[in-house]
């Protein structure tokens, strides 16, 4: 997947128009992953690898990556966050940047629930759970123009990330599991972020290895977040 990123990011449209840096957060994988990432980093000045010494979960991965980037980025930069397990194709970055420019939205989500989206390789049960969570968040949080509250493939304007981090400090991301994606979204909404979405194709069939998501535990946590987010995250 990293090789695919590099190939696409060397595309003249991005390199000449935007410039880029790739930050890879390795969450405690020492099965050869870290050595491979270091070799890639040595060959490309645009790549930074940060390694956790043990598996710490999605929330900490995002804290590590976003904190590192926030210190280097200026308010005019944009931040794209995506999974590196083959499920999120980098080809959508262009569409997301174009959508941001066209609409003026400050966060663009690659959505599983826009017309034209596809979900491939996900069991009917997980699809059902995801759809249920979507309805729950829509009713309880009601963020304008958002249909997909949990997909991690997003582009953010750094000025809003910086504003939220200034407000919440170390608690900008307090959730440890997959519900941190909802937390980030709502806290950005609190600081006035505007949102929009593009359709995309989630390729779960290309994911290597089993999912680390504990479905029942995540479902319970999703309900908790939906009920308490407005009180818990308001400022």
Stretch-by-stretch model annotation:
Residues 1-124, 128-131, 156-168, 175-198, ...:
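Structured catalytic core of nucleotide-sugar glycosyltransferases
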Residues 143:
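Hanks-type protein kinase catalytic core
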Residues 149-150:
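An anion-binding catalytic pocket shared by soluble metabolic enzymes
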Residues 154-155, 214:
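Short aromatic/basic micro-patch
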Residues 199-213:
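Active-site donor/metal-binding and catalytic loop motifs
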Residues 210-224:
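Non-catalytic, C-terminal membrane-associated alpha-helical segments of glycosyltransferases
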């Amino acid at each position: 997947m990293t090789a695919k990123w590099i190939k696409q990011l060397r595309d003249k449209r991005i390199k000449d128009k935007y410039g880029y840096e790739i930050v890879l957060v390795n969450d405690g994988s020492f099965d050869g992953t870290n050595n491979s990432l270091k070799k890639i980093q040595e060959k490309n000045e645009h790549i930074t690898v940060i390694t956790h010494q043990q598996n710490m979960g999605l929330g900490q991965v995002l804290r590590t990556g976003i904190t590192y980037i926030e210190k280097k980025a200026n308010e005019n930069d944009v931040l794209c966050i995506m999974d590196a397990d083959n499920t999120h194709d980098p080809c959508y970055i262009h569409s997301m940047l174009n959508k941001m420019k066209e609409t003026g939205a400050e966060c663009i989500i690659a959505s599983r629930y826009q017309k034209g989206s596809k979900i491939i390789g996900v069991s009917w049960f997980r699809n059902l759970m995801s759809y249920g969570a979507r309805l729950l968040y829509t009713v309880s949080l009601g963020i304008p123009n958002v249909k997909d509250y949990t997909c991690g493939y997003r582009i953010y304007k750094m000025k809003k990330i910086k504003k939220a981090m200034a407000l919440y400090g170390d608690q900008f991301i307090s959730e440890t599991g997959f519900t941190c994606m909802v937390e980030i979204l709502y806290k950005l909404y609190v600081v006035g972020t505007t949102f929009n979405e593009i359709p995309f194709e989630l390729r779960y069939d290309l994911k290597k290895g089993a999912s680390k998501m504990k479905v029942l535990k995540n479902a319970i946590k999703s309900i908790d977040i939906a009920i308490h987010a407005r009180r818990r995250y308001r400022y």
